[in-house]
A protein has these predicted regions:
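Non-catalytic terminal extensions of PLP-dependent enzymes
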Residues: 11-153
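PLP-dependent aminotransferase class I/II
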Residues: 1-8
Length: 153
């Protein structure tokens, strides 16, 4: 329920004109990132217009999971990975309307560095993150031995 109240407050605060502008910025930001990253990531739908998000594939020999974890290591929110399922090693970027050009350019630079590092030494990305409180999880063990709890505190 709380998220609905927050969304309504956001819409009321922006108004019709502000919502239109926010949508335009979200679309502009997604298309800007897609264009800037076309030489770094594989863009499967390169010649199609994207709305507020776009999908890319990790370059040959690199995994989307490793790229996402390396972004977390740099303090950058990772994109959605492995969705949609029809895109191999998928990374789905959804820059919001509030991201500045400087933030988008920093994101591009981080991805360029990560991909370059991965091309030089693919194994170097497989342990990321190493400097965060939570390191790489054993996802296979987590899927096989789930611990579900309602205890949130």
């Amino acid at each position: 329920f709380g998220v609905v109240v927050k969304a309504l407050a956001y819409m009321l605060r922006l108004g019709g004109e502000g919502l239109t502008r926010a949508a335009e910025y979200a679309v502009l930001n997604a298309n800007y990132l897609k264009k800037k990253l076309e030489n770094t990531l594989d863009i499967p739908f390169k010649n199609r217009f994207c709305a507020h998000e776009f999908v890319a594939s990790a370059p040959e020999g690199l995994r989307a999971l490793d790229i996402a974890k390396a972004l977390l290591e740099r303090g950058i929110h990772a994109p959605t990975i492995y969705f949609p399922l029809i895109v191999h090693e998928c990374l789905m970027a959804e820059p919001t309307e509030t991201e500045s050009k400087q933030t988008l350019d920093a994101y591009v630079a981080a991805l360029e560095e990560i991909v370059a590092q991965g091309r030089r030494d693919p194994q170097s990305l497989t342990q990321a993150p190493v400097n965060l409180p939570v390191r790489r999880l054993d996802e296979t063990a987590a899927a096989r031995h789930m611990v579900l709890t309602e205890d949130m505190g």
